[in-house]
Amino acid sequence: MKILLTNDDGVRAPGLNALAEAMTVLGQVFVIAPDREQSAVGHALTLHHPLRANKIGENIFAVDGTPTDCVNLGIHSLLSFKPDIVVSGINRGANLGDDVTYSGTVSAAMEATLMGIPAIAVSLVTSAEGTNYAAAAQFAVKLAATVREKGLPADTFLNVNVPDLPRERIRPPLVTTQGKRSYEGTIVDKVDPRGRNYYWIGTVDLNFKDIDGSDYHAVSRGHVSVTPLHLDLTNYNSIAVLKKWEIF
């Protein structure tokens, strides 16, 4: 089994290192990840300047681009084969609800899915430094082996969120839906010493809606959340409504 790993926290992030070490039990591991943090870059693809990939270890490349760039370079250039699975993570911080649209971690898995490769995004629900990623890494190994054995539905990838708890306190995984979040007061408006305004998009409390069956509902109760996401963003329930508009 050939496994491509990436992330958005950077190639030297402890979550990625823990994942790479754990995944060796399944086969050959290749790491192609950003050379610096690329959190919240979404599905950005670099088109207006060249990319560089530096080999910094055995089967380890640091790319001066986004997680999506890393998957592209890996599959189309740096690797001489198509990986059996792409695993993105382990992200330091949750990727729940609407936040998946911002996530470089999730977008890397989405990019692999666009290329027809099974993919998983894995996040640890924490913001703390020095976090222990072992439990999340072991679950990722188990899930990757299952995906390899059973496959995934077409155009589907898995978004995994693991609560930051001692392994013995983590409750069984649940298949969940993508949750919802309330966004309020995220812009910090300040004036610099020269009298010019500047703005900072700051972090806020999670403010997730506690919807039964959702990703947040699961992790807030100590469960691992596994959410199947897919590429088709069409809102099929709205098609009939729009067709009634007079402009069509």
UniProtKB/Swiss-Prot annotation:
Enzyme category, top tier: hydrolase
One Pfam family per UniProt: SurE
Necessary cofactors: a divalent metal cation
Keyword vocabulary terms for this entry: Cytoplasm, Hydrolase, Metal-binding, Nucleotide-binding
Principal subcellular localization: cytoplasm
Record-listed a divalent metal cation binding positions: D8, D9, S39, N91
PANTHER family, per the entry: 5'-NUCLEOTIDASE SURE, 5'_3'-NUCLEOTIDASE SURE
Described purpose of this protein according to its UniProt entry: Nucleotidase that shows phosphatase activity on nucleoside 5'-monophosphates.
Protein name: 5'-nucleotidase SurE
